[in-house]
Amino acid sequence: MSVQTTAVLMGHYNAARLLGDKSVSSDAMLLIDGHEELSLLTKQFPWPVIGVMGEIEVPGPMGLQSWQPQALKTAHQGPLTLSETVSGSVAKFLADVAAGGAKFQATAYEGTPEAFHYAWKLRDCFFVPEAPDRDWENRSQVTNVTGTLFFHFFGEKVAGNIVL
């Protein structure tokens, strides 16, 4: 049997509400500079976060150990999925980026570029795609190009036009 009273539960509920609504994973867009049209074809992308690279174990006398943080992590990677069009929008993007040195800049929006709470700047991005699978028996799925997006993130935050 629970030991919580309704007053305790209401206190936790009210405290959680004061923190604000939870972010909805789908309420975000990735805008690639020079290829803004791909924002409507971007199904999945990594959301940047600031944190340390890991831990440093610090040994001490008599087997004592402690931890301290490594440097901040600025080189990130994560999954990127782009939905291809019959006109080859993703293939054109990949060819354009490859011809221009393979790197691009991007912005990740909490919202859309027109209406957002805030946005993060992603620097010197490059995409390592996997070859998409095409299957004659699969008439129920769009063609997706998946792979890994590598990028640098320094915590550059852009103020949005939606007041929280």
Regions found by a protein language model. Name each.
Residues M1, L9, N144-L164:
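Protruding loop/beta-arch "assembly-hinge" segments enriched in small, turn-prone residues
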Residues M1-T85, D124-N144:
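Solvent-exposed edge beta-strands and adjacent loop segments
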Residues L30, L80, A106-A108, L149:
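Hydrophobic beta-strand residues in large extracellular and virion-surface proteins
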Residues L82-V86, E110-T112, F151-G155:
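Beta-strand elements of well-folded, non-transmembrane domains
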Residues G88-F93:
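Short, conserved charged micro-motifs
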Residues L94-A119:
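Short, acidic/charged, Gly/Pro-enriched secondary-structure junctions
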Residues A115-W120, K157-N161:
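Short conserved catalytic/interaction loops centered on acidic-Pro-aromatic/His motifs
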